[in-house]
């Protein structure tokens, strides 16, 4: 680069499919609309392999094929590292935007490159502390995570509790921002006219913690006009769970009221389907040892997406969730493990259509005014501007 020339290139790296992460889609698009050239380097992903970013002239995505766990994956990661280094030398980005722990070894190497600056965005935090049972690779990645946190120009986490834990565990003195996983304001939709059915909607990874069997049992307790539509994918750890849900629904005689829509390639299609529903399900277990499940307000994009489509919310009876979504009047709370508790709240929605619709309208207004990614991401833009992009 010639002295004085503005370098507006940012390289995103993530050892999975970046298109499975809405905040990356929104953030990269905001940067692209502010003049940045954006390149994503990632891999395929089981379950989320079909997901894609919408096209944008300033955003490009390249991926290696997916490699399952095992010794081949270690070689695959080495290849990924070399591939990223090649693109850094070829493309010469000013900023590296590294996502999650598995990007940290590569980001640590790139932090040694002169004039390259690092942004570290942790979508999912590692659980617990290291002990004798921890693998060598886990210890290595965790230690490198701390190094990246200390070298990065900026760190981003989607929840305040996670951000505080991150600062404490990594001992970083760098700027750490709390950026919620909100939808883009451009994704806000008018709720479609109501059909003859009362539609519940769920989207995301289809796992017991997010879509418990109790939901199916609750559905069986409700009038036949109540149906559940599920969009998303199974994870490696819960292969076969969709079939288990279908089998249970059939056993209860409500198989025709439970629909699996699969994964939509683009978010626009997902949100269009969402806008035809009445209530969005955003449930978390009441008790869990997982730090990510303990601290999901702001980090879970589900409730924000539902509100953007004008849906009322059904969330778990957790203090933070009730304060954020129930107290302002955007939905109701239940015990996600109790079919009777779930059914009681869903029946209230069914019997109070005017109030239910009002919840969705209020929530959509909150998305437009505050809970949108343009607002959430603005401190990141300011931080990048403060640090400069000029060589």
Predicted regions and their residues:
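Membrane-proximal helix-turn-helix segments that form the acceptor-binding/catalytic region
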Residues: 29, 82-90, 105, 109-113, ...
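N-terminal strand-loop element at the rim of the active site
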Residues: 14-19, 30-76, 161-167, 176-178, ...
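Nucleotide-activated donor-binding/catalytic signature segment of Leloir-type glycosyltransferases, i.e.
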Residues: 242-273, 279
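A short, well-ordered alpha-helix in the C-terminal region of glycosyltransferases
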Residues: 341, 348, 355-369
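Nucleotide-sugar-dependent
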Residues: 22, 210, 266-273, 280-304, ...
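Donor nucleotide-sugar binding/catalytic pocket of nucleotide-sugar-dependent glycosyltransferases
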Residues: 42, 142-188, 195
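Conserved acidic donor-binding segment of nucleotide-sugar-dependent glycosyltransferases
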Residues: 300, 327-339, 348-354
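Conserved donor-binding/catalytic core segment of Leloir-type glycosyltransferases
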Residues: 11-13, 156, 192-219, 229-230
């Amino acid at each position: 680069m010639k002295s004085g020339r503005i370098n507006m290139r940012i390289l995103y790296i993530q050892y999975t499919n970046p298109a499975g992460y809405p905040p990356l889609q929104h953030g990269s698009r905001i940067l692209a609309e502010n003049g940045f050239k954006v390149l994503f380097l990632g891999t395929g992903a089981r379950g989320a392999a079909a997901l894609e970013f919408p096209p944008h002239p300033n955003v490009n995505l390249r991926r290696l094929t997916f490699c399952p766990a095992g010794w081949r994956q270690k070689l695959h990661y080495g290849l990924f590292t070399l591939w990223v280094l090649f693109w850094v030398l070829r493309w010469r980005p000013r900023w590296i935007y590294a996502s999650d722990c598995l990007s940290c070894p590569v980001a640590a190497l790139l932090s040694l490159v002169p004039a390259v600056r690092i942004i570290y965005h942790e979508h999912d935090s590692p659980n617990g502390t290291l002990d004798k049972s921890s693998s060598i690779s886990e210890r290595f990645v965790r230690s490198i995570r701390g190094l990246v946190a200390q070298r990065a120009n900026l760190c981003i986490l989607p929840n305040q509790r996670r951000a505080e834990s991150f600062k404490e565990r990594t001992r970083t003195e760098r700027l750490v921002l709390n950026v919620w996983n909100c939808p883009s304001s451009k994704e806000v939709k008018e709720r479609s006219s109501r059909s003859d059915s009362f539609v519940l909607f769920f989207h995301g990874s289809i796992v017991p913690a997010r879509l418990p069997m109790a939901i199916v049992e609750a559905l069986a307790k409700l009038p036949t006009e109540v149906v559940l539509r599920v969009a998303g994918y199974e994870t490696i750890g819960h292969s076969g769970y969709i079939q288990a849900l279908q089998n249970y629904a059939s056993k209860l005689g409500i198989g025709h009221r439970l629909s699996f829509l699969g994964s939509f390639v683009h978010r626009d299609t997902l949100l269009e389907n969402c806008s035809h529903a009445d209530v969005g399900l955003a449930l978390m277990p009441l008790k869990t040892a997982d730090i990510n499940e303990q601290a999901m307000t702001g980090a879970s994009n589900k409730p924000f997406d539902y509100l953007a489509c004008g849906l009322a919310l059904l969330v778990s009876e957790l203090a933070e969730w009730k304060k954020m979504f129930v107290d302002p009047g955007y939905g109701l709370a239940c015990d996600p493990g109790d079919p009777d508790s779930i059914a009681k709240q869903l029946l209230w929605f069914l019997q109070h259509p005017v109030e239910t619709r009002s919840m969705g309208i209020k929530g959509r207004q909150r998305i437009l005014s505050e809970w949108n990614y343009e607002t959430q991401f603005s401190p990141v833009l300011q931080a990048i501007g403060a640090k400069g992009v000029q060589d």
